[in-house]
Structure formats: C-alpha cells, structure tokens
Amino acid sequence: SPALADEHNDNFLRF
C-alpha cells in the first residue's frame, strides 16, 4: 500500500 511504503508489509490491509 502507498500509505505504508515504509513498511512494505501491507498484508494486514489486505483483508
């Protein structure tokens, strides 16, 4: 996710 570019683990946003 662009908003979480720092932490490339946006898995928790992929609900």
UniProtKB/Swiss-Prot annotation:
<dbReference type="GO" id="GO:0007218">
    <property type="term" value="P:neuropeptide signaling pathway"/>
</dbReference>
<comment type="function">
    <text>FMRFamides and FMRFamide-like peptides are neuropeptides.</text>
</comment>
<protein>
    <recommendedName>
        <fullName>Extended FMRFamide-12</fullName>
    </recommendedName>
</protein>
<comment type="similarity">
    <text>Belongs to the FARP (FMRF amide related peptide) family.</text>
</comment>
<keyword id="KW-0027">Amidation</keyword>
<keyword id="KW-0964">Secreted</keyword>
<feature type="modified residue" description="Phenylalanine amide">
    <location>
        <position position="15"/>
    </location>
</feature>
<dbReference type="GO" id="GO:0005576">
    <property type="term" value="C:extracellular region"/>
</dbReference>
<keyword id="KW-0527">Neuropeptide</keyword>
